[in-house]
Amino acid sequence: RKALDKMATKAKEYYFVGDADQTIFEFAGSDADYYHRLSRNAEQLEQGHRCGVTINSLCKRIMRPIWNYYGYERVWKPTGFVGDHYYLPSLQTNCSAMEALLDKIQNTNETFLFTYRGTPSDSWVKNFFKREGIEFAHVGNNAHVPKKEIRCHKLWPEFCRGKPMSLKQIKDFWDYAGSKVIVRGKGKETFEDWIDREYTIDYLINKKFLKSTASEERDFSLIRVQKGKKEDYEKRLIYIKKILNKGFNDGDVRVKYANIHTVKGLTFDNVVVDLTMTRPEDYFTQLRLKYVAYSRGKFDCWTVASQGKYTLGVR
């Protein structure tokens, strides 16, 4: 801070890299008030290059009380896209806004961020994904269920019907399949000395790697080795079947979720913001968090109403 004060008084020209309006780590020592005062008279870059008109206007309304308090204005020119703002009473409510969200997740290749202030919103979001059969991942982590696991469920019936599969895919089958189809003593096979080409189920049966009845077992969930608690395992299988019934996309996971504090600096096509808070917080802190949340999106945004006593961004 002393270095910044000295720079601001002696340097003829200096640059701020960042945004005082996104100062959300006060719990870690960040001084939002200082950054607001330091940057309020600075010449600003005007083009945002991210948010469409609707999200841009929403973010300006969110930040207006802070701008008025510190006596500055931000231009924040939007992109050419307009976009829509939808309202959800909850993630369990069937309504036109929910239909629009599910339709866009299912029928476009756009990305989605579900973000929130904290618990228990994280559990609500994950339960929503599982209920709707939506592939998802936490920001910065792998998918909740690996692609290769879902792929095994999808491709095993085709393999049983005689379609050749790559050696890599056969290795993936081996990671999950059990003694119902694999010959005793072959469960730990690594296939390291096998030629990297396609193989049929008949080939593996003839070579005594799969049992003679393997091709009759068309449901991969019935030949897998159970891992973890039975209840959790069964829920996992139900979730996988929902994904397959909706049409499995083998591309990157497009739906992510995370706490607002972990999404700063990220960009998604669409954003879903849960306004639930479980305790009171400084009003300006709430506004900065709310702004960070919505400004991750480029096109459309959904607001999920607070499910408790406190609402993010409301005194």
Each language-model region and where it sits:
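The feature marks helicase ATPase cores and/or their adjacent C-terminal helical subdomains
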Residues: 1-315
